[in-house]
Amino acid sequence: MALRKEVHIFCIAKRVAVNGVNSNTSGRMRQKMAKILCVCISKERKTCSQNIHECEADLQGLVGDVHYGMGGRKQVSLLPYEKVKEYFEQSEEEFRCGRFGENLLVEGIDWNSIAEGNRFRCGDVLLEAVRIGAGGPASDAYKGEKVCTPMEPWFVFCQILEAGRLREGEIILQQR
């Protein structure tokens, strides 16, 4: 019988097995791990986001972002790196974070499993998914035209439930 090794990380004083089961909940709460690759904000509407590598997130949004303090629940947008990478591999454009106006470019989440109400723990910050997909024609941030961007279905908009600092390289735990 082969011995099975489990690697553990410590996150907010809880042991979380890399296989995705929170050991403190006997498997009742499934958690997925991912990582923030880019933290981006925009200073103006309808422009590409700029990668600033880390940012303060409070209950009004991302400090310094054009949407900060505007109310509403769509305070932070997440986009899957895997889909963005696929887009750039098929286009002649050079890869860059913020190309689609996203706030967080994230790697490692099963985006097909995300539902409204899912939560994401990023260090001290707790996000809750409030909308999946951009919906309808949107302004393509890169060209400033009304078009349907290929990333629209993949956007996940979140509300900030607990404030803190978002950083590149931060591990994200997805809670369903």
Q: Where would I find each of the regions flagged by the language model?
A:
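Positively charged N-terminal leader segments that act as targeting/secretion signals
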Residues: M1-V7
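Metal-cofactor-dependent catalytic cores
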Residues: H8-I12, V16-R176
